[in-house]
Amino acid sequence: MMISNKAELDKCREAAVEELQSYGCRILVCSGTGCIATGSEKIYQKMMEIVGNTPNVTIEFAPHDEKEHVGVKRTGCQGFCEFGPLVRIQKGDKVVQYIKVQPDDCQEIFDNTVMGDGLVDRLLYKKAENTYVQPDEIPFIAKQTRVVLGKLRQI
């Protein structure tokens, strides 16, 4: 599709936002160089396997039926490389950031956070006496201002 003016671009953007909102949940696996070096591709493959083998859950680019739709996606750098591999779970307005995820953690993340409303506490970032669930609450990430690549963590 060729976009030739701003109105067409705005229409494409609105369609993309509507499509993203149709997912019940998005699993975002960091594929920045640091996370790839620490094994994020294995995390991605394991999540795809788990979602693909779960009854009444489907992975599709364009949801169109009554099943629960879960998107599994590689993203650009999520900005917290020291603690990779990183996985974010987006359900509506709720975002959970998991750190140092290993393939053996994927089923627990899927069962507790994707299919339920729970957390995997040991995979959350902790500093001093604080536990951080949402990525924007983590002090290091909260101080980052991404101007050009602001949406890289989501796309």
Labelled PLM ranges:
Residues 1-155:
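Feature of Fe-S/electron-transfer and energy-metabolism proteins
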